[in-house]
Structure formats: C-alpha cells, structure tokens
Amino acid sequence: MAAAVLGQLGALWIHNLRSRGKLALGVLPQSYIHTSASLDISRKWEKKNKIVYPPQLPGEPRRPAEIYHCRRQIKYSKDKMWYLAKLIRGMSIDQALAQLEFNDKKGAKIIKEVLLEAQDMAVRDHNVEFRSNLYIAESTSGRGQCLKRIRYHGRGRFGIMEKVYCHYFVKLVEGPPPPPEPPKTAVAHAKEYIQQLRSRTIVHTL
C-alpha cells in the first residue's frame, strides 16, 4: 500500500516538473494557445485592391479608381473610432482632412494618417491624376484584439481590466462626392413603416 502511494506521488512530482520546464522554456501546450477570431485577422480588405475588371468598351465612360486601405490593431476603442469614421463618410478627401485637423481626439490623428497613406497610394499605384479628386465612399471601424490583464487593488484584492484594440477601414473613390440625400419627411417614414408591416410573413406557414 505504501509503495503504491509513493509511486503515485513520484508520478505526480514528475508531471509537475515537466509542466514547469515547459513554462520556463516558453513551450505551452495547445490548450493554452489563444485561438479566438480576433487573432485570425483576415486580409480581405486589402485584397480588394487586386481586383482586375474586364476591359471597357470604346464609348463607355472611364471606371473610377477605388482604393482600399486600413490600419489594424490600433490602441483605441472601436466605439470612439466609429464616431470619427462616420463624421467623414461621404466627404471629399480635402474636407475630411480639414475636419480631422481641428479635432483634438486621438483617433482623429490616426484616421488622418491613414487617409494620407491612402491618398499617396492612389497616386502611386492606382493612376489617379489629381490627389484632391477623391472622396470617402466607406469609412468604418472594427473590433480588434482584446487582452485581459490584472489590475491590482489594495488589501490583496485585484480586478480584471481589458486592453482593447480596433481596426479602421477606408475606401476612396475617384471623382467628386455624391450629393447628400435629402432628409426623409414624416410622411415618408410613415409610408415606409406601413410597407414593412404589410411585408411581414407568418412563420411556418405557406
């Protein structure tokens, strides 16, 4: 009986020793590896720059250039970045840069850098003749990696804090910006609401 207990203790001691050795050498088992979707960052946004369109017909108007650019893993909140991204949506590139120049938020400086990079990319890689002949067709933010860390409190207590990151995506299109849509009237909102009610379907019926 004593020999069996000693054998179990010895096996447990060897197992603990191996696990400590793995941690010391930086070799973690697969169960400790972070495999969430935030680390699996897709590169689909930049790949849109490589789309090859078919040749245009002789009398067809020239297709405007489209520039996709982004910056990832920004140490900033995605919600705070979204307000700035929505602010410049639909503006010309010069107007957007002017708006961001006089905004004292941290995200405004980051978005301005991304817009200048996209503007240089348009002239260099997409055959855009005039740097100012661009407008912001799409501007949005996304959630990045979220890391949990310990926040030390008094009397031996602690809390969990989150270090959040975000992504910023922008699409520039060659040409003047489209005119803004007129605001909907109350009658138009009511008609749209009535149409939605009439378009409803009953679930699990023909």
Curated annotation (Swiss-Prot):
GO molecular function: RNA binding; structural constituent of ribosome
Localization: Mitochondrion
Family in the record: Belongs to the universal ribosomal protein uL22 family.
SUPFAM superfamilies per record: Ribosomal protein L22
Subunit structure: Component of the mitochondrial large ribosomal subunit (mt-LSU). Mature mammalian 55S mitochondrial ribosomes consist of a small (28S) and a large (39S) subunit. The 28S small subunit contains a 12S ribosomal RNA (12S mt-rRNA) and 30 different proteins. The 39S large subunit contains a 16S rRNA (16S mt-rRNA), a copy of mitochondrial valine transfer RNA (mt-tRNA(Val)), which plays an integral structural role, and 52 different proteins.
Highest taxon listed in the record's lineage: Eukaryota
Protein name according to UniProt: Large ribosomal subunit protein uL22m
GO biological process, one term: translation
GO cellular component: mitochondrial inner membrane; mitochondrial large ribosomal subunit; mitochondrion
Keywords annotated in UniProt: Mitochondrion, Ribonucleoprotein, Ribosomal protein, Transit peptide
Pfam families attached to this UniProt entry: Ribosomal_L22
Signal peptide: none
Encoding gene, per UniProt annotation: MRPL22
Organism: Homo sapiens (Human)
Annotated organelle transit peptide span: 1-40
Statement: the UniProt record of this protein carries the keyword Ribonucleoprotein: yes
InterPro entries, alphabetized: Ribosomal_uL22, Ribosomal_uL22_bac/org-type, Ribosomal_uL22_sf
